[in-house]
Design a protein with these regions (language model features):
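N-terminal charge/polar-biased segments
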Residues: 2-3, 178
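Sec-dependent N-terminal signal peptides
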Residues: 4-13
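N-terminal small/polar-rich segments of proteins
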Residues: 20-114, 144-183
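Terminal beta-strand-rich extracellular "head" domains
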Residues: 103-105, 111-143
Length: 183
């Protein structure tokens, strides 16, 4: 009987069920997030090429600089002088988290659709060579801005309206979309 008891004890001691488990450990870390003010842009003024005339024989263009300068070329000419022409760059207000930098982008070209004076559709005109002036950079040519201590910056956008020879009198409109993103 004693031999059976020793064999039974030996069988229990060597059983995998009774074997010691391996060592384990745990660790804890942190999860975190910082929520900041969303960045937004609001249009304040439209890009306005003013009132102009078009030559019957020569194509032309009018360029409005982001800083406000205007240049007529080729067959495009102002319809009148001074404020009557109504030329101005577009202006946008950007707001978000104070002190943050951001990037602004514009399309390469936008298309202005027209309505003929007296009705009907006019041929589309291209607006290209869009330029930027960011108040936070004092007029330097850049697409990276900096929000001030109030979380604001202002952007001016200029561009060039291309006018084919013989363009009929019409009212033109285009949508100018800018995109601002935090850097």
């Amino acid at each position: 009987m004693r031999k059976r008891l020793i064999l039974a004890t030996a069988a229990l001691v060597s059983s995998p069920v009774l074997a010691a488990t391996g060592q384990s450990a745990t660790a804890s870390g942190q999860a975190q997030a910082v929520i900041i003010t969303p960045i937004i842009a609001v249009a304040l003024n439209d890009l306005d090429f003013g009132s102009l005339t078009s030559s019957r024989t020569a194509s032309g263009s009018v360029t409005v600089g982001a800083e406000g300068a205007v240049n007529y070329a080729g067959g495009a000419a102002p319809a009148c002088g001074g404020a009557c022409a109504g030329v101005a760059p577009a202006r946008f207000l950007v707001s978000g988290e104070a002190g943050r930098s951001y990037t602004v982008s514009t399309p390469a070209t936008i298309t202005a659709s027209g309505t003929l004076i007296g009705g009907g559709s006019a041929p589309a005109l291209a607006i290209d060579a869009l330029t930027l002036h960011l108040d936070s950079h004092g007029g330097a040519v850049t697409s990276i801005g900096q929000l001030d201590d109030k979380g604001e910056d202002r952007i001016a956008v200029g561009g060039r309206l291309n006018v084919p020879a013989g363009t009929a009198p019409a009212h033109y409109r285009a949508t100018l979309t800018i995109m601002v993103t935090y850097s």
